[in-house]
Structure formats: C-alpha cells, structure tokens
Amino acid sequence: MTVQPQTLKIRRPDDWHIHLRDDEMLSTVLPYTSEVFARAIVMPNLTPPITTVASAIAYRERILAAIPAGHKFTPLMTCYLTNTLDVNELTRGFEQGVFTAAKLYPANATTNSTHGVSDIPAIYPLFEQMQKIGMPLLIHGEVTDAAVDIFDREARFIDQILEPIRRQFPELKIVFEHITTKDAADYVLAGNPFLGATITPQHLMFNRNHMLVGGIRPHLFCLPILKRSTHQDALRQAVASGSDRFFLGTDSAPHTKHRKESSCGCAGVFNAPSALPAYASVFEEMNALQHLEAFCSLNGPRFYGLPVNEDFVELVRVPFQQPEEISLGNESIIPFLAGQTINWSVKA
C-alpha cells in the first residue's frame, strides 16, 4: 500500500490567468491570490478595457495599493487587443515592462469582451510585431459565430483561427488559455515550444453533468463552458503526463451572488480561495503529485522567460472547508466548492 504524503513543499506558484476586477471587488478578492501566489497575469477586461500603457499603470497601482501587509505579490499586466489598437502603444508597453503579454478576446466571447477583435486577420500586423519583440499572445480560444454550438466553439477555434495564426507566425509565443477539450489538449501536446496552455481547477474537477444534472448549478458556469467527461478526462491526463506545455491558470472570475443566481447569470468561477488545494487534490487522484510543482511553479515562468520564485509554500494534509459565501459590502460572492471540504490546506 502506498503511503500518502502528509506535506508537500513546492516553489511558490504563480497564477497565469486571473480576473481581479476593480474597486471594492478588487480589495475583497485580491488577498486570496496574494496570500498564496507570487505573481499573476491580470486580465484586462475591465470597463473600459486596459488598452493603453497609462491605463495599465493606473490599474497596477490600484492592485498594489490593495495588497495586504505582509503579502509579496507582483501583478503582471496585459493589454486588451482591439481592432484599432496602436502597434506603437503595444510595443512601448512591452518594452517598458508594463505589459507582460497581450490578450485576444474574439468579440463577445466572454465577460466584457464587446471591445474584442471582430476581424482577427486584420490585426495580424500586431501579431507580427509581437513575434518580433517576443511578446506573448494570450488567447480566449472560442469562435463566436452564433451558428456554432457552444460546446463546439473551442474545437472549431483551433481549425479556423489558431492554426492559421500559428502557420503565419511560427515563433509567436501563444498561450491557449483555459483549455477545456481533448481537441485542445492534443493540439498543445502536438505543438512546438512556442505554444502553451493553462487549465483551471474547475475543468479538471468537473464536467457538464455536474453543472446540469439534478438542477442548474450557476456557480460552475464559466466560459469556455464545462464539457463532457471525455474532455475532462483528457485534461486530467494532460496535467498528469508531466508535459511542460501546461501550467496553472485559475481564470478565477468573481461575480456577486445575485449576478450569478439570476435569469441570465454571469459566466465565471471564483476559485482563488481554494485553487492550490484543488489542484493538489486532482494531481493526487491522478497519482501525479510529482508533477504538481512543475505545473504550478515552473512551467509558466519558463514559458514566459521569467525566473522561478525563490521561496516556497507548504501544502499539508489538513482538510479545510470552504466558506459558503464571502462578504462584499452589502452583497456576497459564492466561492468555488462553497461549503465543501478539500483534503489539502496551504500552511500559513
């Protein structure tokens, strides 16, 4: 019988995809990330979106001001690509160290993406410059054609959009974000070292049956949407393989309770409070704890060309129960796995 480890010591992880929002929401959710993660790629889909160096600097300052005392955390800012973005602004932001990467949202693919790109080949000059200067492109990989079934939008994106981009710009660093399908996992595994992918805890732990059978569970609704179990299994196999193409990106995306539990609920899962223990539980189930540190702490920095973190965090086999909800002024946020117990805790 295999003896289960009681503690796991790994280099401090980074979150390569997060939504921190702004104002009171920012100050409420940020500590759950800054307590555990050293760095995070911060999504730019505010209202209005982050499209200039000045707006990115201002947002970064608001984030830094919200970090609790004693937390060491660095927000890595991103530029929201639009049909009319100035290539010089993009270049200046990257060369000044303000923008770590640029984010491609196909128009209307997800929350606050109405300003996204409606004609992707039209912004190929931006991709050409990004390839030249070594700036990573982060992609929400779904087509938005209303005629395409929501469960097929990621797979269709690979053929219609991602493959042509990669053929045209073979040395452009691309992160295929929050992948949800076997198609995407296989595509990344078959790709070259310029292609990586993030995977969320919810897509590793759940499939669409969990969201839809026995009643609709709106707090599992995110985009890209949870897929069938065969896709979930493929994602689990991908992270358990130890491939360095995959790394941690929670896509933690908080919304207030009433915006989730409504007749037209928002997409997004607020998983920051439980993310690292949730990932550990998946890797343990897959008998792959030996690959947890690389997924959480090594693969991402190496893809981005950044140093790995020097300090460590410890996970201990002490069950902890997620709160049912988290206060936000007069409202609340329902966290991922609300009220449920996870077998791992991050040691304070």
Curated annotation (Swiss-Prot):
Species the sequence originates in: Yersinia enterocolitica serotype O:8 / biotype 1B (strain NCTC 13174 / 8081)
The record's free-text note on cofactor binding: Binds 2 Zn(2+) ions per subunit.
Residues that coordinate or bind Zn(2+) 2: K103, H140, H178
Protein's name according to its UniProt entry: Dihydroorotase
Function: Catalyzes the reversible cyclization of carbamoyl aspartate to dihydroorotate.
A Pfam family that the UniProt record links to this protein: Amidohydro_1
Pathway noted in the entry: Pyrimidine metabolism; UMP biosynthesis via de novo pathway; (S)-dihydroorotate from bicarbonate: step 3/3
NCBIfam families listed in its UniProt record: pyrC_dimer
Family label: Belongs to the metallo-dependent hydrolases superfamily. DHOase family. Class II DHOase subfamily.
Reactions catalysed, as given in the entry: (S)-dihydroorotate + H2O = N-carbamoyl-L-aspartate + H(+)
Any one GO CC term of the record: cytosol
